[in-house]
Amino acid sequence: MGRKICLVGQATKTAWYAESLPSDVEMWGQNESYTVQKRGTRWFQIHPRAWRKAEVLELGEFEADFYGRRPDHVEILSKLEIPVYMKEVDERIPASVKYPFDEITAMLGEIPPETPDEPRLYLTSTSAYMLALALYEHLNGDTVDEMHMAGIEMAVGTEYSLQKPCVEYWLGRLAGSGVTIVRAPMTELLRAPLYAIDHEMPFVDKNFTAENAM
């Protein structure tokens, strides 16, 4: 039997779904999703320490060496007794481990035609990093039967909407490798009208003009 994993984000529309799952489902949290989830098996903080340094210093309530979050973020992560995946080990977080970026790139990276000797991963969000690691482990024998998604929406009209195609790309790669994808009820992921069936006209941006098409 393979593992069952649930990726948890902070979107309140579907974050509740994680708590409805049985205890044998691994809970992979990210960033500040500890505000919506009660247990975790792994954690992910992929941002650089000085993430958006200029912006966070302007806000005053954030600090530049805390991954663009409030100072208590590092304090909370420092108390976790589960692996905390990061770009680099943080001495303030005893459970921090380095995300195996090079190994995953070598195994799963795409080959850009302009740089055929440099495999590159398609990753536009922390959730994508999490899915890539799950696929990497699955293909290396630590198999995954089910991948659940909770609190990860990336809805159109939000700053995260540009990250949605990448998450759906990795879900597709997992599905193609035999993993069952289980979505929370009413999620925005993998959901859209059927082209030429559910509507008569293609989606059209009302603000589209020849000038802004470039």
Where on the chain are the PLM-derived regions?
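Metal-ion/cofactor- or nucleotide/acyl-coenzyme-handling active-site neighborhoods
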Residues: 1-214
